[in-house]
């Protein structure tokens, strides 16, 4: 699918901001580089490096068939002997790892200002300074490079020579696995557990899955580490339920770290690259691990959605809660609620302030609703929180038809954004405030226009750096009924 005009504008702003300083440096070095090229031409000719392919990981904001220049310098070219990551040349995850953190934030800020320029001009506001990890753009002093912030780590497995089990990251643009001794942005210890799983599989002769031949057993592993707790959960993805030496294998995995409380097996026998299958069972320990956000406790099941960067998640959720302005007796609808984290944090915050509200969460995934109901009970909110397994658009259309009361609406849709029907019904319900969290500002910008046309004004929009060292930015918008 070709990029839209808004997407191209966002990309162009990132490129210009990220490369502005590099142009000054390159102009000073042009003469010396030309001399060097002349000398090297007399020596042994070297083959040119093929053009690098675009990064296609989760942090990419759009997909396009057009040639795409990464908004940060190519990881393959940016590496130096002092790089904090030993595999930065091959890994496509942290393409800006070698850039100063302040410059990363400045590039993202420029992109968001470009993307939301029309909306901001229409509303007479400016995009707030981006909230980085431990720092806001514009703050004086140093901007330390974030490390160890990803509390979810994963690996694919592939067969090696003589029964070896290979694990690590896919090399950028390929399905070739690059070994990862450690990852500077993952929670400490997570990568050691993943590498240990491969060694235990080798020891017990459990073959890795070959995705081309569709043979073998061990496909993936996911490690999730608590932030406010020290609990760890491991999910093993296998091609079938039965494994040789299964009990020994599960116990060996559980013994890799004393903080592992859950080992789960997910069975995925389908062809293709999807990581998880439909069946999951607990093979060691508790059904869930536990973590905390903004004073709320959350049980996290093996396949539940839970933010990868909990430190920035707390910041993002607090911005949303502040924007809600909840009052006594309000009805808060949490659309696309997942396991209920945003709504429950807001309800707990209101309760702690002595403000009674009613929370209604809507999520189409039944597993997410089951987690949300369990988490409501865990936080003593069962009497004031209800969660419905339904499509958000279908539910809000019915609510609008029945003229139901909604005082505050919280939206956190998938990357595709919301639907026109949902937004039209949201405007018909006339909530006093709307908070819109987005993992894709391009689709959020599109949706905000419809909300403004439907009778709302944009109070503020704040970028949040959820994934440092990438070009990914999340945003929170706060709207009020005119």
Task: Cite the ranges covered by each PLM segment.
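Nucleotide donor/acceptor-binding cores
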Residues: 151, 230-232, 329-330
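Rossmann-like S-adenosyl-L-methionine
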Residues: 3-29, 35-38, 42-43, 48-54, ...
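Short, aliphatic-rich beta-strand segments
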Residues: 223, 230-239, 297-301
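Short helix/loop segment immediately N-terminal to the Walker
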Residues: 207-215, 332
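Solvent-exposed residues in well-ordered beta-strands and their adjoining turns
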Residues: 156-158, 224, 237-239, 480-482
């Amino acid at each position: 699918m070709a990029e839209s005009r808004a997407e191209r504008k966002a990309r162009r702003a990132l490129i210009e901001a990220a490369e502005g300083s590099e142009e000054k440096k390159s102009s000073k070095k042009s003469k010396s580089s030309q001399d060097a090229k002349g000398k090297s031409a007399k020596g042994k000719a070297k083959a040119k490096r093929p053009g690098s392919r675009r990064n296609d990981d989760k942090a990419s904001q759009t997909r396009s068939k057009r040639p795409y220049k990464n908004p940060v310098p190519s990881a393959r070219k940016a590496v130096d002997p002092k790089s904090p990551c030993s595999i930065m040349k091959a890994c496509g995850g942290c393409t800006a790892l070698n850039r100063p953190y302040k410059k990363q934030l400045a590039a993202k800020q420029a992109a968001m200002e470009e993307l939301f320029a029309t909306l901001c001009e229409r509303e007479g506001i400016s995009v707030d300074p981006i909230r980085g990890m431990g720092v806001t753009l514009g703050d004086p002093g140093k901007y330390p490079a974030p490390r160890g912030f990803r509390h979810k780590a994963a690996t694919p497995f592939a067969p090696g020579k003589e029964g070896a089990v290979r694990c690590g990251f896919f090399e950028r643009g390929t399905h070739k696995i690059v070994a990862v001794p450690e990852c500077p942005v993952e929670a400490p210890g997570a990568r050691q557990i993943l590498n240990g799983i491969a060694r235990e599989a080798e020891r017990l002769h459990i073959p890795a899955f070959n995705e081309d031949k569709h043979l073998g057993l061990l496909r993936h592993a996911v490690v999730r580490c608590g932030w406010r707790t020290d609990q760890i959960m491991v999910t093993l993805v296998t091609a079938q339920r039965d494994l040789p030496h299964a009990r020994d294998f599960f116990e060996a995995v559980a013994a890799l770290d004393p903080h592992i409380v859950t080992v789960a097996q997910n069975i995925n026998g389908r062809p293709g690259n999807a990581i998880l299958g439909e069946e999951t069972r607990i093979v060691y320990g508790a059904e869930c691990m536990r973590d905390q956000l903004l004073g709320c406790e959350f049980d996290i099941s093996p396949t539940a959605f839970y933010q990868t960067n909990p430190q920035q998640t707390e910041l993002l959720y607090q911005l949303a809660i502040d924007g809600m302005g909840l009052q006594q007796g309000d009805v808060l609808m949490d659309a696309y609620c997942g396991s209920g984290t945003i709504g429950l944090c807001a309800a707990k915050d209101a309760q702690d302030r002595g403000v009674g509200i009613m929370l209604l969460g809507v999520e189409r995934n039944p597993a997410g609703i089951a987690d949300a109901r369990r988490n409501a009970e865990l936080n003593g909110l069962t009497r004031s929180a209800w969660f419905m397994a339904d499509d958000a658009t279908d539910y809000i259309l019915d609510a609008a038809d029945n003229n139901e009361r909604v005082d505050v609406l919280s939206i956190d849709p998938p990357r595709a954004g919301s639907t026109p029907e949902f937004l039209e019904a949201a405007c018909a319900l006339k909530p006093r405030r709307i908070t819109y969290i987005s993992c894709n500002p391009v689709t959020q910008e599109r949706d905000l226009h419809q909300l403004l046309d439907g009778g709302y004004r944009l109070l503020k929009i704040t970028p949040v750096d959820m994934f440092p060292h990438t070009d990914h930015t999340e945003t929170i918008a706060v709207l009020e009924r005119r």
